[in-house]
Amino acid sequence: MITPTVKMRILSSSHLFYLALCLLTFTSSATAGPETLCGAELVDALQFVCGDRGFYFNKPTGYGSSSRRAPQTGIVDECCFRSCDLRRLEMYCAPLKPAKAARSVRAQRHTDMPKTQKYQPPSTNKKMKSQRRRKGSTFEEHK
């Protein structure tokens, strides 16, 4: 007859075996060496690594690059024809963009619109100026 302590030891040893098997599986996949990635697998891996930043297929170069230089090697050359690791994939990620401040509609005033000048026909302006002159001259005469 099997006692409860014997059952516990049998159960524990089987759990220990499965635990060791899981650990070996996860550690071997986590420490796996570089692998080759081509086509959709390469794009999926770049999207996973780079996220929202996006990525380049060729390494970004400076503005002064000329076409006379040696042809560039891209991610396909490095990861499809040869094997590459995670660090190599990260080199092709686009740089982070600075976060834009969120603008609230409530924060904007309704008076932010530029004020337009009131339009007055030119004839009205001349009449008003002449009336002012007359008033000014009559005022001076009464003094």
UniProtKB/Swiss-Prot annotation:
| Family stated for the protein in its record | Belongs to the insulin family.
| Biased segments, Basic residues type | 126-136
This protein is called: Insulin-like growth factor 1
A: annotated span: 74-94
Q: Where is this region: Disordered?
A: 99-143
Tell me the GO molecular function terms. growth factor activity; hormone activity; insulin-like growth factor receptor binding
Residue ranges for the region (D) are 95-102
Q: What does this protein do?
A: The insulin-like growth factors, isolated from plasma, are structurally and functionally related to insulin but have a much higher growth-promoting activity. May be a physiological regulator of [1-14C]-2-deoxy-D-glucose (2DG) transport and glycogen synthesis in osteoblasts. Stimulates glucose transport in bone-derived osteoblastic (PyMS) cells and is effective at much lower concentrations than insulin, not only regarding glycogen and DNA synthesis but also with regard to enhancing glucose uptake. May play a role in synapse maturation.
| Species the sequence originates in | Oryctolagus cuniculus (Rabbit)
Gene3D superfamilies registered for this protein in UniProt: Insulin-like
Q: Is this entry keyworded Nucleotidyltransferase?
A: no
Q: Where are the transmembrane segments?
A: none
Stretches for region B: 33-61
Q: What is its main location?
A: secreted
Q: Which residues form the propeptide?
A: 103-143
GO CC terms of this entry: alphav-beta3 integrin-IGF-1-IGF1R complex; exocytic vesicle; extracellular space
- Which Pfam families does the annotation name? Insulin (PF00049)
Q: Subunit structure of this entry?
A: Forms a ternary complex with IGFR1 and ITGAV:ITGB3. Forms a ternary complex with IGFR1 and ITGA6:ITGB4. Forms a ternary complex with IGFBP3 and ALS.
Keyword Metal-binding included in the entry's annotation: no
PANTHER family, alphabetized: INSULIN-LIKE GROWTH FACTOR I (PTHR46845:SF1)
Under the heading SUPFAM superfamilies, the entry gives:
Insulin-like (SSF56994)
